[in-house]
């Protein structure tokens, strides 16, 4: 209960920060954003499009999702839409309950970061039956037709993990700590990683000592499971982690054993702490995802789909980058942004984009 109250207050502060004042059409959360497209503008409050945004709370406590929400809500308001945000602290059951609540709030479109990409399918089917379009944000919901999916190429993220580790440790012992088993992205990342490292496993240059999976995207769970591995052995040369929170857990445990910086560790999301670890020399690489781009693109897509579903035939839906299968019998129009591998030598990329400030990144470096 206390955790839910803290999240509620935190969310309120974020929304106030991102949505106060008149929007200039120039920046959202310090990032360059195109001015509102006239064809997406709503004519008045009584006809205003309402977007429902359902976020699995377990993901919201991860740093990058705070940025996604601020950019998305700011861009949606630039386009004349209102956004109802619901955080599901109780897992998939609460997320389903909150989705049903938003249906009754007359939302024109639903955007979902799913807690469980399979168990949520029934609720999404009800949304579709109500005539409401659905966009899966970052996590491709399985088993039900979707109007769109927007994310980054998770297989490419896995390949970026693999390339970074193979360049740094072409021969050695590897540990792989995958993300949540409830998130299809975890499996895509794993497939991309193995695409790169498996040839070296097969020829004997790389020994995959352990590969483990987490139930949730949880740094606490990662600490527990990685510690259990380290109780058996710390004889590793490289560790691939599903995200930066997991990488942080691994590096914390390595630090306790005076091994931080001696083992190559990679993650994703370009969390501030990860960028700090990179310049400090304890993390090799993080995968940076330009949240400003995906947040704005998602807002534009959601508004276009919502207005189109409401009967505005003048709206043109942007062409997808590709279509993906989600075991629903239909292909999902998918909008995928590119990610960048960030090392110490190119850390300025996250600074130039305004993702983090130079002072923050180099705070612990003298």
Which residue stretches match the model-derived regions?
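Exported/periplasmic ABC-transporter solute-binding proteins
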Residues: 34-35, 237-241, 251-324, 331, ...
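Flexible loop/hinge segments that line or gate small-molecule binding clefts
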Residues: 117-156, 166-167, 173-179, 271-277, ...
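Bacterial N-terminal signal peptides that target proteins for export
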Residues: 1-7
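Hydrophobic alpha-helical
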Residues: 111-128, 193, 215-277
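An alpha-beta-alpha
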Residues: 57, 69-72, 83, 160-203, ...
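Hinge/cleft segment of the Venus flytrap/periplasmic-binding protein
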Residues: 20, 25-49, 184-185, 196-200, ...
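C-terminal motif of bacterial Sec signal peptides marking the signal peptidase cleavage site
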Residues: 15-18
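Hinge/beta->alpha junction and helix N-cap segments in small-molecule ligand-binding domains
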Residues: 54-70, 85-94, 116, 139, ...
